[in-house]
Amino acid sequence: MNEHQKLVNCTPYLYYFCPISHLPSILKIGILSRNEINQKNLLSEDWSNLAVQEYRSKTKAQLSNGNVDFIHNMVCTFFNPYNTTIYKGQQNIGPEYKSLSVVLVIDVKSLFLNNPNLAY
């Protein structure tokens, strides 16, 4: 069993949180990294914390192939749908949060079957 198969077995789903207003764009062109969204001028609504985004814009991470890249060149997903980002969203937006946001469930197995390069 290779590393990708082990990952899929341990983590069958990833979760992506965003304002529901982003869904048409996601359905049309997919989930993009923060830098791709900014380059294409697609950010119509932003609930993120500016201080956190500033920090992330300067932060790099090592990929599974050994390369290092800025995390804003990657898509931020979560292993658990109940996480700090969603908690903060609920806190900042208030009761209307449920009707304004969406958590997308991403099947990891389908991702790797359709594009094995995603691990890199």
PLM region spans:
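Active-site-proximal loop/hinge segments that shape catalytic or ion-binding/gating pockets
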Residues: 1-76, 83-120
